[in-house]
Amino acid sequence: MSPSWRRLAVLMLVAAFLVPAPPAAAAALSDAGFFGRWSAGAWTVGPRLNYAHAGLKPVESAVKAGNYALAKQRLLDYYRARPAIEAGGFSHTTWPGVLELTPSHIWTLGSGEVYVKTLTFGPGEKTVTADVTSSIASGKPGFFLMSRHKDAVIALINSRSKGSGKPTLRLTLADGSVKTLHPTHDTYIWQAHPGSVYGTKYYMQVSDQGLGPFTGETRKAYLGFDLGGVAGVKKAELTLTGTAETAKDIMLYGNAETFDEATRTWTNTVQNTFSWEGDPGGFDWKLPDGADNEYLYQLPRFYFAGPLALEYQKTGNEQHARTLIGLMTDFIKDADVYDADQGAGSYPGNLHAARRLHNWIAAYEILRKSPSLTPEANAAILKTMNRAGLYLQVNVNGTPNKMQSQKITLLHASVYFPEFRVAPAWRTNAADFLSAQLNDSTYADGGYKESTDAYLRGYLRQYVDVVAFMRRNGITFTATAKLRQLSRFLMDQSYPSGYGPAYGDSDSLDLRSTFEKLGELLDDPELLYVGTSGKSGEKPAHTSALYPDTRVAISRSGWTADDSHLRINADRGNHSHPDELAITAYAYGRPLLPDMGTFTYSTDARAKWLRLTTEAHSTIEIDDQPQTSTAAGGISHLITNPAFDVIGANTESSAGARHERSVLSLHSGLWVVSDRLKPVDTVKQHRYEQNWHFAADANPSIRSGTEATTTAFATGANLAIVPADPAEVASTLRDGYYAPRFYAVENAKYASYVKTAPGQTTFDTLLLPSKGAADTSATVERLPVAAAQPYEATALSLNDTAVYYKSWTAKTPRTFGSYTFDGKLLYADAGTIVMVDGSSVERAGATLVKAPAAVKDLAVTFGGDGTVRIDGSGLTASTDPAKAIAIAAPNAAKVILNGKAVPFQREGALIYAAA
């Protein structure tokens, strides 16, 4: 048991003597259970309030007199008069429609569906136009329609199949031109007929009535537009024509999800917006049938508390206070009977209870003086917050971000509620845990145990806030060094643009503000540099990085937005995907091989493909099966050099074969990926599918003959993917999905290269990024290696101008083309020689490089001005031919060794400058 968990166990035991035990069954906390019961001069039920705290004597007197109604009034009087205490911030501050729709018990999960406005149709036919510029500008090419009120009226909205009055999207572009689009797909779904498809109907039906989140009369409509090739939209207007017998209000939402009208049904649609409008019971705080599980978790977090409380604070409009207080007390009434632990305080568990309490504390600081807050409601809210703290004090969860959130909220509660008897124990419990938890949540190399950069960003951002909070309140934080190490880990994962690579359950977020805050908090100039895009701080002293325990390696050419970045992983843990040895690659300002993202945690087929299949990642899927996460594997090495990196990795996560992947990363602008597959059964035919994934707007194509895949983004960088054995692979562009952020998904093409073979086999692939259009002429030709099969040693001719060699087995002198080499890896072109663990390179019998002993890593670059740059680990200046490396450089005029000019000696075409 780690020290932090031991401390937690001790504090749990101590806490048991401070407060009464929680009820054995789900129930509300009684007045006596909160205020205590006084009888015959003693407390027969201990109070949860510390009546010795200044100002609480009137409450105590009322309780001892048995008058709980008076005690509640005096407790409210106390909190209304209490000086302000730092209450923390809200998780959310506002979003479109929150003030209008929340009082009607209409709520949306996530950001994939965003409210635009309410439209009115009927009576009779009516055409309406809505400004949807903000929706289009935020990357939402679709819309959905939903009834604003629960009533019997059905609206019929013309579909694209209608001869006239079909939906129209009018786009005004930056150059003043206007483009008019009709939907490429539109349809509606109907709960009473969950498997029916309505994509060819003339009308889209919209209606809703009855209690609960939906009934058999619930119908929702969806429209999707193709915005491919459209850029610079200055204004967007959506025009719809529809009819209704009487006036019918319809909510219009922007939607970031693509769909197929020929297959969309109620059953296969992931719905994120539900309405309890008109239901006297309001939200039931449970999971609607068919919804993403996150709906159950996130609705009770009270994200809307911030917008409502802040609007009340700003305007003084009591309606906002009444709405929020009503939602809080409704939640307490319902959830007190849902959870046998601490009732509404613990429902629906760990992170969700913590997020809610955090929002409630911040809201209470604003609401405590509201005339709408009654003594009864105030007591109910305080009881629930007390119960939530007790739950967070003892609840254990193995996920780092959940435990962190619990203890951060507990710490805030301990500071904000000094009146609670248990507050000192909360403070000690939370502060100790937050300092110790960084050891439990990280590997020995400093990497994060959850395989997701988005969650790590949130984890670090919360540490930024809580450490500052602790310092303001005189609470010691002792894990600064570990926090710095973890911050550096995320810094290494980040793209040169400062965005995250979106591995695991993530979306690509701008990490720079987090790095800037961490740099300021930790006084770290390198974090500050990355967080400000080089405007402050100091450039990191390193580029590439290896995390052997976390099982991740990053090859990076530098820290500016135009630098290159390649990440390869064999990592595991919570939120990981079956993506071992997957590559993400970035160059010239763009992710060229991005991670495909997550979409949702639902059972939607697209989300399951993204999260649960190996096929959805840029690695090799074996025998059509996803990888497992329990087999051997890891990053075997990262060799770094100012001119190049070499990464080696392996995994046995596919039952049929061991996959080994080697990457040569030339910082001058290319990657070569070599894969070797070693099956357990060498007789059986195995199917190996090497996949390369792109963003939705990459427009990839495959060139016949070379089978090279090239992207064609409208602007900016592109990528060519060139296989070494085009005749031996079945190459196709396949249909997949890309989720650029949570709750958004787009159709996306990806390149698939399939080999079916017994025994060992290989893939060798050139990845060639370009600043503009992709190089469609790039070629890769396999060079025979004397006395070796490709799975023993592979050699390639790249564009007929360069040669690449990789030995999979013990090094020995081998000949390929006109070259002879005795090391593990070689790359050579007219201006560069790169070698790993070798001593001799010859071309057509002439020496190019000759060292007295094997050199770990060596890069020689020949400049047109006669400058020869030599880079290598452990090399020192030497002109002694008996000790130094001989390099063929007949035109050498100057030698730079590891960044410094050094003398050199010439003997014929050879020079000696380093040993």
Residue ranges and their predicted role:
Residues 506, 602-914:
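CBM-like, beta-strand-rich accessory domains located in the C-terminal region of large
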Residues 140, 217-220, 229-237, 669-671:
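Extended extracellular/luminal ectodomain segments enriched in beta-structured repeat modules
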Residues 2-27:
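Secretory targeting and sorting signals
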Residues 133-135, 223-232, 557-559, 666, ...:
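Extracellular and analogous surface-interaction loops
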